[in-house]
Amino acid sequence: MNIYSKAKRVLRGDVNARTAALETMRRLRVIRARRRERAELAELNQQPARLREEFARIRASDLLAHFRSRIQPKFFPGFQDATVTAQAQRQIFPDETVRLLSQAKRIGEEHCWPLLGFGERCFGREEILWNRDPLSMFDWPLDYHADINLMRNDGSDARVVWELNRLSHLVTLGRAYAITNDEKLPVQFWQQIASWRAQNPVACGVNWNCAMEVALRAMNLLAAFTLFLRSPQMNEVALKDLLKLFDQHGAHIQRNLEFSHVATSNHYLADVAGLLWIGVMLPELAAAEGWREFGLRELLQEMDKQVLADGADYEASTGYHRLKLELFLYSFVLCHINGIDIAEKYWSNLRAMVEYVCAYLRPDGRAPLIGDSDSGQVLPIVRRRADDHAYVLALGATIFQEPRFKAGTHTSGGQYAGGVRTEDELLWILGEQGLRDYQALTGSRPPSSQAFSDAGIFILRKDDLYLLVNASDSGVNGRGSHGHNDALSIEVSACGTAFIVDPGSFVYTADLSDRHLFRSTAYHSTVQVDSAEQNSIEEAAPFIIGNEARPQVINWEPGETADLVVAEHYGYRRLAQPVTHRRTVRFNKTDRYWLVEDQLTGEGTHECAFRVHLAPGLETRIRSDGIVEVCDKINGARLLIVYQKPDHQRGQSIANDLETTLEPRFSSNDYGAKEPSTSACWSVRTALPYSAQFAIIPVCAKENERERLGSAIDSANSQMDKN
């Protein structure tokens, strides 16, 4: 089989002949480029920083003086004016400052800090072991980066060691130094940089395997470099070593761009953002101008490709929407403060991305974890849980002077989302003036029902009531990667509690069984037929998912007193006896309940399971009257899920009535963390066509259940009679 035929076989989705040919040629070029890179490893490590001629010929002391005195380029205002920012940090955020300094102390003295959802980890008391997975204790080899197999099936997880090697903890050290002027912090910074360089020769090992990781590491190093530049510990030798490291990072990204003519993703976006940042902030490097121009051009082209018309990320993932929004937003701000023009069209697209976040945040201020999430952040000024997206709203509120975005950073009760302050990033990215601008924003209107038709996301909400319908495809124009088997799945929040939730992701390659479990149909609040997956999944391929479901929205009718959305998917059409699933969701805003109707059409007899995945920490029981009751013991709120028999079955006890059970599950709100949860399942073996209807009725703490249940059921029955 020739390389063209091989490429055609492995490319997923519809690929025309021209695109397949271009991709074939690109892959041939990659093969040749890697041969050259492999042959030049020694030279790549020995080569000094390639400086522009006017900087290459000056003395090292003059070069250091130049960096300390230069006015342009500028990093983010909070970093650039670190003394002012540090004073504001102490005065405005005293509790956060205490935590920051405590974290910096642990990082410097014991090499310990939080790692994703795994909690605090220590990485070597004497010297950090940069290539050791701190969970499995596997030592990644220093093989040529492209030879490393990331799928080992031994519990090791490249994502974990990559997080360590993004070096974001060095930004914590730098912020603490800005506040304390403690010279032990820059000493620790330089020791860790020297240690990292010694253990990670260029293009060798897992930490050079993925250009995205190289780019994110460079971004964090630029932030730390800005904060430590004024330290006496920054001498001529240290500067020379850092410039060499930045040049190596930029050159490696350029040699190993994660581009494809078929589809690009967050990886390529991070690659080009990394080149843009290095190019903007280090014009002294000979390659900087080319990196800056290429990075900006590609960044904007990727916004055209990867951001849908309604502002949503095209990878069918709210987690990667957050990451991409950070990449675009921070890059746009960096360009703006350095006089680099970005067309208004792209600022409008950026605003649309922020609008999407504002719409999908639940009343508790948390994000629904649709699709994959690895908890990734660009500059983790504060390490945020995977479902914490409110801080990007704070940045968006200030940039676009939009009070609605500011209102979205708080819960419906006026508290910070999850009790975590959202202004830290504001202060360090936009500076003290940005924080003042944010604080001056007043006035807003409550969020309302909203459709994101391109993304396939529909939000039916009023006051404390929130239901999200997911009618998205598997992502990347149907090619899949970070999508889940969640077609027509729902999320429900009411009375200040998230009741029905997406399960999240948990882990990727560390455990393929859990990886597939968390993205399975059975783990989502939708209907499963004959135990089949909505989209095909390959057990050995954790980042491939089919697009057989192809959800289609039939109707969307928002209104003052009621909302309606109707959608269907075709994932079960590939069964021996094909089945189509149509879901209709009605939101009665007056009587405060939702009615969900599932219609299964086709031929033959099938096993059908209607599930809702419930949030952890709730008490769930099946009552004697058949109602599933979900209770939040903390605030007294309950959610009642009532199976409504079709009109012709009311009052009857029939052989194929639904059996209700509670199934043990897990939920993950952060990469690497999981908690026990429950799914309620109504199952039946029945001939098709078949329909089932469920009334979802919230009862807040001070409400009378009998009155709420009676009025909602009467209204639901009336609605069913009309249908």
Residue locations for each model-derived region?
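Membrane-proximal basic amphipathic "stem/tether" segments
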Residues: 1-62
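Acidic/polar, glycine-enriched structural segments that form the non-catalytic walls/loops
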Residues: 40, 45-48, 52-55, 60, ...
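Beta-strand-rich N-terminal accessory domains
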Residues: 54, 58, 62, 66-70, ...
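Beta-sandwich/jelly-roll carbohydrate-recognition scaffolds of carbohydrate-active enzymes
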Residues: 134, 446-448, 456, 595-596, ...
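Aromatic-lined, polymer-binding surfaces characteristic
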Residues: 137-361, 366, 374
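Residues that flank catalytic or metal-binding motifs in active/ligand-binding sites
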Residues: 165, 271, 353, 454-456, ...
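CBM-like, beta-strand-rich accessory domains located in the C-terminal region of large
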Residues: 215, 373-374, 380-385, 402-421, ...
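Carbohydrate-active enzyme catalytic cores, enriched for enzymes
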Residues: 312, 316-500, 555-558
